[in-house]
């Protein structure tokens, strides 16, 4: 394996990270720093805040977010599979059908248990 081919990637990462750190540091050093109570107070359209911004969320929002991530990952697997389907042939097709069947069974299980009900 030729590691010299990865040198541009390493250089890109080092230069990008160094530039980011340098710009943030220069901004912190040269930028004005005069905090007072008015600047640090929360601002909501010219009015005092009506309620605390840190309120509790219903756990169902997190459930929906987790389900979205899971099914989003499923679609992330579907695209490269569709592109490479001609090369991988029937074994790849059957493997993806088993994968999709597992997701379908998981979705049916969540639905049956009431995980998608919002009541």
UniProtKB/Swiss-Prot annotation:
Q: Which GO terms describe its cellular component?
A: NADH dehydrogenase complex; plasma membrane
Query: Which leading EC class covers this enzyme?
Result: translocase
The yes or no answer to whether the keyword ATP-binding is present is no
Primary role: NDH-1 shuttles electrons from NADH, via FMN and iron-sulfur (Fe-S) centers, to quinones in the respiratory chain. The immediate electron acceptor for the enzyme in this species is believed to be ubiquinone. Couples the redox reaction to proton translocation (for every two electrons transferred, four hydrogen ions are translocated across the cytoplasmic membrane), and thus conserves the redox energy in a proton gradient.
**Subcellular localization:** Cell inner membrane
The record's subunit annotation is:
NDH-1 is composed of 14 different subunits. Subunits NuoA, H, J, K, L, M, N constitute the membrane sector of the complex.
Q: Provide this UniProt record's keywords sorted from A to Z.
A: Cell inner membrane, Cell membrane, Membrane, NAD, Quinone, Translocase, Transmembrane, Transmembrane helix, Transport, Ubiquinone
Question: Catalysed reaction(s)?
Answer: a quinone + NADH + 5 H(+)(in) = a quinol + NAD(+) + 4 H(+)(out)
> What are the TM regions of this chain, as residue ranges?
7-27, 63-83, 88-108
The protein's matches in Gene3D superfamilies, at most eight in alphabetical order, are given as: NADH:ubiquinone/plastoquinone oxidoreductase, chain 3
InterPro entries xref list: NAD(P)H_OxRDtase_bac/plastid, NADH_UbQ/plastoQ_OxRdtase_su3, NDAH_ubi_oxred_su3_sf
Domain of life according to the entry: Bacteria
- A GO molecular-function annotation: NADH:ubiquinone reductase (non-electrogenic) activity
Family membership:
Belongs to the complex I subunit 3 family.
Which Pfam families did the record assign? Answer: Oxidored_q4
The name this protein carries in UniProt is NADH-quinone oxidoreductase subunit A
């Amino acid at each position: 394996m030729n590691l010299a081919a990865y040198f541009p990637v390493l250089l890109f990462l080092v230069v990008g990270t160094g530039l980011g750190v340098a710009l943030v540091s220069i901004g912190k050093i040269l930028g004005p720093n005069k905090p007072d109570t008015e600047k640090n107070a929360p601002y909501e359209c010219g009015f005092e805040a009506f309620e605390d911004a840190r309120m509790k969320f219903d756990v169902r929002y997190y459930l929906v977010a987790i389900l979205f991530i899971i099914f989003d990952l499923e679609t992330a697997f579907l695209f490269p599979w569709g592109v490479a389907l001609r090369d991988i042939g029937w074994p790849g097709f059957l493997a993806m059908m088993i994968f999709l069947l597992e997701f379908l069974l998981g979705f049916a299980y969540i639905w049956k248990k009431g995980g998608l009900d919002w009541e």
